[in-house]
Amino acid sequence: MDSNTVSSFQVDCFLWHVRKRFADQELGDAPFLDRLRRDQKSLRGRGSTLGLDIETATRAGKQIVERILEKESDEALKMTIASLPALRYLTDMTLEEMSRDWFMLMPKQKVAGSLCIRMDQAIMDKTIILKANFSVIFDRLETLILLRAFTEEGAIVGEISPLPSLPGHTDEDVKNAIGVLIGGLEWNDNTVRVSETLQRFAWRSSNEGGRPSLPPKQKRKMARTTESEV
């Protein structure tokens, strides 16, 4: 096993522990707490994959961080912060909407790369809006935290979430996954809309109805599916 992989996991475990202590003092805001929960799932998945104990890794990560901080000057810290690109966290959903449990009458699930797509195929003839919480860098979607599909009544009928055991995805991965979700929901005569925030950063264009323009690959796939059903 690569030593950098192990040490990276150890440092991530310790930094998560620090953030958890911060949250325990009721100092974290909603985006902070949301990332904390997501990262906990990711660390559990990585620990299982690597065969490493999280508690032991946390202690080792603390030693690594302490060694770095001993050599770190205030001036070097300022220069590091100044060189980082600005990262923004955008939220369409409230904390309650993100953490709410939901179930499907006719579940369908598909894994696309490192993203898991889930939808309820029992939903028909509804108006549905897609909302997402995600980070943006250089005016492009950088990391999807969670996307959910809501009916006008507020019921959750679909979801796209990163797989904890497979971290990392691109904005194109997200775009393609949303195309799959939209295609599945529209198949049952639902009308799907996308939030303005998601349109702005996940797509550069949309049609007049507020529906995103699907990527060419997704268009071809949906066209073939439609033709086969006629």
From Swiss-Prot:
Motif (Nuclear localization signal): 34-38
Region (Disordered): 205-230
Motif stretch (Nuclear export signal): 137-146
Region described as CPSF4-binding: 180-215
Ranges where the record places region PABPN1-binding: 223-230
GO MF annotations in UniProt: protein serine/threonine kinase inhibitor activity; RNA binding
Alphabetized UniProt keyword annotations: Eukaryotic host gene expression shutoff by virus, Host cytoplasm, Host gene expression shutoff by virus, Host mRNA suppression by virus, Host nucleus, Host-virus interaction, Inhibition of host innate immune response by virus, Inhibition of host interferon signaling pathway by virus, Inhibition of host PKR by virus, Inhibition of host pre-mRNA processing by virus, Inhibition of host RIG-I by virus, Inhibition of host RLR pathway by virus, Interferon antiviral system evasion, RNA-binding, Ubl conjugation, Viral immunoevasion
InterPro entries with a match to the protein in the record: NS1 (IPR004208), NS1A (IPR000256), NS1A_effect_dom-like_sf (IPR038064), uS15_NS1_RNA-bd_sf (IPR009068)
Keyword RNA-binding: yes
Region feature (RNA-binding and homodimerization): 1-73
Residue ranges of the TM segments: none
GO biological process, one term: symbiont-mediated suppression of host PKR/eIFalpha signaling
Modification comment: Upon interferon induction, ISGylated via host HERC5; this results in the impairment of NS1 interaction with RNA targets due to its inability to form homodimers and to interact with host EIF2AK2/PKR.
Principal place of residence: host cell
Compartments where found: Host nucleus; Host cytoplasm
GO annotations of cellular component type: host cell cytoplasm; host cell nucleus
Quaternary context: Homodimer. Interacts with host TRIM25 (via coiled coil); this interaction specifically inhibits TRIM25 multimerization and TRIM25-mediated RIGI CARD ubiquitination. Interacts with human EIF2AK2/PKR, CPSF4, IVNS1ABP and PABPN1.
Family assignment from sequence similarity: Belongs to the influenza A viruses NS1 family.
Entry domain remark: The dsRNA-binding region is required for suppression of RNA silencing.
Function: Inhibits post-transcriptional processing of cellular pre-mRNA, by binding and inhibiting two cellular proteins that are required for the 3'-end processing of cellular pre-mRNAs: the 30 kDa cleavage and polyadenylation specificity factor/CPSF4 and the poly(A)-binding protein 2/PABPN1. In turn, unprocessed 3' end pre-mRNAs accumulate in the host nucleus and are no longer exported to the cytoplasm. Cellular protein synthesis is thereby shut off very early after virus infection.
Identification of the protein by name: Non-structural protein 1
Organism: Influenza A virus (strain A/Chicken/Hong Kong/37.4/2002 H5N1 genotype X2)
Lineage, uppermost ranks: Viruses, Riboviria, Orthornavirae, Negarnaviricota, Polyploviricotina
Gene coding for it: NS
